[in-house]
Structure formats: C-alpha cells, structure tokens
Curated annotation (Swiss-Prot):
It is an enzyme of class 7 (translocase). It comes from Nitratidesulfovibrio vulgaris (strain ATCC 29579 / DSM 644 / CCUG 34227 / NCIMB 8303 / VKM B-1760 / Hildenborough). Its EC number is 7.-.-.-. It is found in: Cell inner membrane. GO terms for cellular component: ATP-binding cassette (ABC) transporter complex. This is Putative ABC transporter ATP-binding protein DVU_1056. GO terms for molecular function: ATP binding; ATP hydrolysis activity; ATPase-coupled transmembrane transporter activity. It is a peripheral membrane protein. SUPFAM superfamilies: P-loop containing nucleoside triphosphate hydrolases. Residues 235-267 have a biased composition (Basic and acidic residues).
Amino acid sequence: MTDTTGNPLLSLDDIHFTYPGTTAPVLRGATLHLAQGDRLGLLGHNGSGKTTLLHIAMGLLRPESGTVHHRNAVAHDEASLAALRRDIGFLFQNADDQLFCPTVLEDVAFGPLNLGLSPEQARERATQTLQGLGLEGFGARVTHRLSGGEKKMVALASVLSMQPTALLLDEPTNDLDPATRQRLIDVLNRMSATHIIISHDWDFLARTCTTFLTVDDGIVCTSRHTPHVHTHIHHGGEVAHEHPSRGCCHQHDGSHHHAGHDDDHPHTSQTTE
C-alpha cells in the first residue's frame, strides 16, 4: 500500500499516558507523525517513554487522552487497529514476545496465513523472507533453541513476511553480533524502508535513519544530538559521533528536519557494540 496524498501513514497527537498504579505520567502530550519515506531515529534515556509510545501506536496500550490516526482514520477499535497492523509492522524489543510457534518456518509463515495466503503460499513467502535475511536453512529449526540474535532476526522475518508499508523497530540490534548487525543495516537500506527505530546504538541509527527525534519529559522533540558516521579509523572501523546542536529540546510538531551537523560544537565518539 502506498500513500500518494502526502498525508502521514501514522499520526500520534497529544498523547498522554500513565501506567496503572503509578502517579508520574510517562507521556505528557507527545506528538509524532510518520509519512511515506520517513526514516526516523527515536532517542531518549531508559524509561523516557519511547517503547510506550510505539505500543500506543500499535494499539497495545490505550492512551488516557490524545488520538492515533492511521491514514487519516482514527485507530480506536479492533477493525481499525487490524488495518493498522497489516500496514505497519512492529518488532518487539524482546523477540520472545513475538515468537510462539514450534519452528522458525511456522513463526514466519503465521502472519501471511492470517493475511489469507494459502499454506503453500505462506510457506513460500516465509522461505523467501528468511533467505533475504541470510537465514537459509533455518526453517526447520526449533525457535526456542535459537540464540538471542537468531531469535531477533527470525522475529524481524515474521514482520517482513507480512510485507508492511512501514516498520516500527524497538532496539533491533539487541543481541546481534557485528556481522548480523551489518546484515540488518544492509537489509534496511536496500529496502529503503519507511520506519521508526528506537535504539541506543548511535552508529546503527546514523546508518539507517535521516531524521532524529528525542522523547524527553514526556514529549517528542527535535533531537539535541545527531548521530553521524565519520569514515575514519577508530579502534578498527568507522564510528558514529553525536553532534550537540544549539538550544534546548524543542517540541516536535510532526514536521521533520533532516539532521545536519554543527561544527561549532565539540563532538564525542560513542561506540555501542
């Protein structure tokens, strides 16, 4: 599905949320828009509300107030949320939350079966998706016996097999070894996928995203820091640097400003392998 109207695929507007049993709000009027072609990196400290925001986007949590729109329609009931989930794929931070079938092939074919493909078509699509991620020969393997990194890639395969328009990826590099991490970067860039990625891996974000936002004090704002890849050798390879920008964190209004660096400020290297 391709949106040719210029309207956002996904809009979260003025989202407020507090977890039951707590008094401190996690989100205090957060606004986030994802349009076709956007490649957004979502930054923020642990507990800032990044994952909560994506869970609300997918209908896994309900906000106290604010609205979620999918292609200009309010996503508020099972029918509208089902349409959203067919269009937008979500990778959980913990792969065990996503995988529940005995074998890898069954896990990856589960989504296509739910979309109405025949068992044969679903198996074929699952096999092709696994091959595209470098997971040839994984189909018959028992899912719960995989390593953490292997589970993460199989979980991604289960999302990609549904051929979504956009991706929401929560810490996709967790548990990945360097070679698999690079393969994921290559896959995302080859797909030119519309996505939002949560990650503390600055180098990964610099290589896969073009716009950077921060969740801070319950709102989404233009990022104070921008990851940049510099092609010089540092401990054996290229590294990402963060460039602090001038000013405070300004609340994000749904428009995107592609990040540039500010050479008037010092920068520090940060590796996150």
